[in-house]
Amino acid sequence: MSCDLFSLATSGVSGLTPYRPGKSIEQLQREMNLDEVVKLASNENPLGPSQIVLDAISATKDLSRYPDGDGFNLKKRLAKKHNLKVENITLGNGSNDILEMVTRAFVTTNHEVIYSQHSFAVYPLVTQAVGAKHGVIPANGWGHDLEAMLSSVN
């Protein structure tokens, strides 16, 4: 018996377009007949990790264990360093993760999410995933039109 999992997904999720990464270095070299390519897309580091990072990873004894899911010690240190309360810190696997958590927690199909025309690519993705309406505000020159954004809030 087979199951089509896509048929079980919400309309917001099933309507998402899969992320298509840029071409690989090898593909660019082949297509453009280049010997060297430095890929700067996708927030990739062409230099690799620094020796300090490699040393820190090597020194970590518990790397094969799940980390503290609440990040208690990290939150405690961040709170102390930045003079914040621990409960005011949210940890995530990058901004994508945090934006997705916030959207799932607070945005419903009855909401409209307002964002600028040239803002972070994750805003439309998480908005669509929860089935909310998009409020895309055209750019003002090369910047955000904050007045138009404010007047669009309903």
Regions inferred by a protein language model and the residue ranges of each:
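N-terminal "arm"/small-domain region of PLP-dependent enzymes with the aminotransferase-like
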Residues: 2-65, 150
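Conserved core of the PLP fold type I
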Residues: 64-154
